[in-house]
Amino acid sequence: MAKKNAKKSKNPPATIARNKRANFDYKFEEKFEAGLSLMGWEVKSIRVGKVNLSESYVFLRDGEAYLFGCTITPLNTASTHVVCDPMRDRKLLLNRRELDKLQGLVERQGYSIVPISMYWRKNAWVKLEIGLGKGKKEHDKRDDTKEREWKIEKSRTMKHAAR
């Protein structure tokens, strides 16, 4: 039985959404934390967890970074006087130095910018972790899978050997 005075955590978990395919499809060399410019209905939907990062990517236009393809499904109880576009481009808030670095690497060296996860910072701001990396080839993906399976098998063997 639970106590009546037991404190329940009113804070939602820190991670809102993850792009699970990102680590499988890309080899990241550097990661950045970016803020998001959101509307009120988007924040409400994010608090409920109606976010999908799987098909999204970041592109640079006019010296600014934008998140494209991220789906934030509007709530049924959202305001009726605001037109909710779940697939709109959302501006990323980065420092000028970070934007210049990303711009240079993407244009000159063929890097891609991919969102990795969305999370709460201090339970007030929505942050997006983006990764700067290159796409993996098919043989790289197979090597990663073999390495992961070998680690699992090795840990099982060590566990049984300790008995």
Curated annotation (Swiss-Prot):
Span list, region Disordered: 135-163
User: In the UniProt record, which is one GO cellular component term?
Assistant: cytosol
Biased composition (Basic and acidic residues) is annotated at 135-156
Q: Where found, per UniProt? A: Cytoplasm
Q: Which GO terms describe its molecular function?
A: RNA binding
By its UniProt entry, which InterPro entries does this protein fall under? SmpB, SsrA-bd_prot, SsrA-bd_prot_CS
Q: What is this protein called?
A: SsrA-binding protein
Q: Which organism is it from?
A: Shewanella loihica (strain ATCC BAA-1088 / PV-4)
